[in-house]
A protein has these predicted regions:
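Beta1/beta-strand and adjacent pyrophosphate-binding region of the FAD-binding site
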Residues: 2-14, 32
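N-terminal Rossmann-fold NAD(P) dinucleotide-binding loop
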Residues: 17
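Aromatic pocket-lining residues of Rossmann-like dinucleotide-binding sites
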Residues: 24
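Conserved N-terminal/central alpha/beta ligand/cofactor-binding core
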Residues: 29-30, 35-133
Length: 133
């Protein structure tokens, strides 16, 4: 049996677990993320539920990593040819037009953006994700 070692081990590929692994890997710590399914991102991906956030989320009350993720979602839609200019020019808009969340978007987009955030650390070996574990 091959022995593995890590500085940080996170069990749970939820959005919180994924961003915790991202934050740990960013500091250079060898990080293992164990995900229950074959997708990371929890609520935003596997559960297909938009983020449930407080009413001040656009100004305060979240980490820099999550704020960067939110910005990437909106940037994706700003570059989409079918989004009208009046919407593209707003600082904050809900791509899915939801009244439940301020940032409704499809699970596959959430997974794509999360994987893009993790990619440099996956490529360097700083982060390893164990799926369906």
């Amino acid at each position: 049996m091959k022995e593995l070692s890590a500085d940080v081990i996170i069990y749970g590929g939820s959005l919180g677990g994924t961003l915790a692994a991202y934050s740990a890997a960013k500091t250079g710590r060898r990080t293992f993320l164990f995900a229950e399914s074959d997708w990371i991102g929890g609520q935003l991906t596997v559960q297909a539920v938009p983020p449930d956030e407080h009413k001040f989320i656009e100004e305060t009350g979240c980490t820099a990593s999550y704020r960067a993720y939110r910005k990437k979602v909106r940037e994706h839609y700003r570059s989409h040819p079918y989004i009208i200019d009046s919407l593209k020019n707003k600082d904050y808009f809900c791509p899915g037009g939801s009244t439940v969340s301020r940032l409704a978007h499809p699970p596959k987009l959430a997974l794509k953006l999360l994987m893009e955030m993790l990619e440099p650390f996956l490529a360097s070996g700083t982060l390893k994700v164990f799926y369906s574990s």
